[in-house]
Amino acid sequence: YRLLTALTLGTLLWGCTESGKKAEGPFYIDIESRAQLHDWFRYAPERPIVVSGHRGGMVTGYPENCIESFEKTLSMMPSFFEIDPRLTKDSVIVLMHDATIDRTTTGTGRVSDYTCEELQQFFLKDREGNVTPYRIPTLEECIVWSRGKTILNLDIKDVPLEVMSDFINRLAPANVMYTVRNARQARTYLDRDPQAMFSCWCKNMKEFGEYAEERIPWSQMMAYVGTMMLPDQQELYGKLHEKGVMCMISLAPT
């Protein structure tokens, strides 16, 4: 309850000025270098709560994994976004959480059964199933749009690690980070991109030790610790904070 109250309050505070008046958006986060990205996620006890838009936000009329939805969220508060890259039949990286397009578009079938051009015939749907005028974006379109506006956290689905790493290295965006589920994944990315920033699954002291063993720089990670802060994991949170690592929980239903 306390955490939810703090999150709600933090969200409200983002939209207010010192005079108590509502600030007007958009609320952009301008990251110009990897070093600045690392610093942005540095833990400090006095720092206000940071909000991550799960799949970009889920406002009625605005679909998940959609640039227009990201803009809508940023019109209300500063946020970084967790998004879901997938490969099309012709190896273009697009944004889609599910393996199929049934739930979130007017089409049916697997993402990998369509070329990127073929996917553009379908319209995205919001969380209530309402059809919107928006279409499936490519990851490259999203990255180009995001520069000077926000941070993108890639929760990679079926894109091979080497393909994604080469893609990111080619575009060299300062404001993009990777979600990794274990230390070995982080090390593999780091070997190909030494300045990479990570959202690391780190839910217990065993996993904490594995990141240390793989020599993942603490300055280049944020720790996803689960759906809530647990009393029996206080040692973990303390160790992460000692290393300057920000902890993240998820309040999204899926």
Predicted region positions:
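Bacterial N-terminal signal peptides
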Residues: 5-12
